[in-house]
Regions:
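N-terminal propeptides
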Residues: 1-51
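Active-site-flanking segments in enzyme catalytic domains
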Residues: 51-226
């Protein structure tokens, strides 16, 4: 069908799969057909970019190909007000194992998957799995500096001492202070809606202060003025 050929060629040109002067009436060879099909399969113009990818453009650097899906899936879990504040504040996320290894050598702390540098406004990641934990560090500092809770660090020191061993999540096993506890709790909460790792455990009937704290933040839109 000549009309079909013309319509098809026009679409191919729009997608960049054929040259602007290509003639739809010419018979193409099998090799040319294979070339066009391959271009169509690998063409990215036809695929709509996910909103979370568009939103984070210019924020994420050196994201490994193998981590793309996991990274954006977790970033989408971060409440939108926090993501927007992160971007507006000029923060960046860099996948930089060299930077992390240098820090490990200087500090003597090894096995680090992520770091949050407030002075640089940068989160450094070795793997995507640390994203939510590090975003928790950013958010806790934001809570303090915006005046939502200027005592959030001391508050979570107290909460950690009460809750660490009664079922609240502590995935890193490095909760030496309230900040690490907060970051772990944030990561678990935005993923599951709870901070308790085992809601059916022995503390199931206990009222966890950390749960109430995050429930209030979520109910008020995460970033607000007192």
């Amino acid at each position: 069908n000549p009309n079909t050929n013309i319509d098809g060629m026009r679409t191919a040109k729009e997608l960049g799969l054929a040259t602007k002067d290509a003639d739809a009436t010419e018979i193409i060879t099998r090799a040319q057909a294979v070339s066009i099909i391959h271009a169509a399969l690998t063409n990215t113009k036809a695929a709509q970019e996910p909103p979370i990818v568009t939103e984070m453009k210019g924020v994420v650097k050196d994201l490994p190909q193998s981590a793309i899906n996991d990274f954006y899936a977790d970033m989408a879990k971060v409440p939108e007000p926090i993501r927007k504040a992160f971007i507006a504040d000029g923060w960046k996320i860099c996948f930089d194992t060299e930077k992390i290894n240098e820090y490990s050598d200087k500090s003597g702390i090894y096995g680090i998957d992520g770091m949050t540098f407030y002075s640089e406004k940068t989160i450094y990641l070795a793997t995507a799995r640390s994203l939510l934990h590090e975003m928790g560090h950013y958010y806790q500092e934001k809570i303090k500096t915006t005046g939502i809770d200027r005592n959030v660090y001391s508050t979570f020191e107290t909460i950690r001492s009460k809750e660490k061993w009664i079922g609240t999540l502590y995935s890193s096993n490095r909760q030496t202070n309230g900040a690490e506890f907060f970051a772990d709790a944030f990561s678990y909460y935005v993923t599951n809606g709870i901070v308790r790792a085992d809601p059916a455990g022995t503390d199931a009937k206990a009222t966890l202060q950390s749960q109430e704290y995050f429930d209030e933040l979520a109910a008020k839109g995460w970033l607000f003025t007192r």
